Amino acid sequence: GTLFVNGQIRRNASVLNGALTYKQADNSTVIINGSNAIPTRAKLEITNFGSIFNMSGTSTLRLIRGGGTSFGDLFLQAASNTVTGGTILCQQGGIGTPQTYSIDALVPIFNLTVDGSTALNTATARVINNPLTIKGALLINDDFSIFSGNGINVNILGNLVNNNSSNATGINAGGYQSGSVTQLTT
């Protein structure tokens, strides 16, 4: 089935404590639109003692809007996690403005896909604060899709598929951008 969330899945906006349990399995889809979001809270925020993040199967978590500030857009610092499958998809729905999706994850994710579609619908996934571990594949889908390591280490246990045909070179050019000369991608 599909769950459409117009806003965010997060803690109460007035406190930093609180815990959520997020479990997604099989071929389910969760779409977080991020409409009228509080920018100081992530679109999906799983953190604190007692929080759980589980993702498996061929499930898909799609983030439509970026723009989160304090905690980014995907803030995964769950106390407990089991990640054996699933894809996190940074793909807007034809909003008409480029979107940057900030990812701060202390827990691993399985697959990450960055999927823009036109110059007006460019999608950039950007790592913030903590090293990112991707247990499966990182897919940079097309010329309007960018992944930025932002100078933070990225560990990809599966494949890196970069379909961005840009011939630009450098730490801040092309489809995969390390962000610094000391950033480590393994």
What are these regions (language model features)?
Residues 1-186:
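Extracellular beta-sheet-rich ligand-binding/adhesion modules
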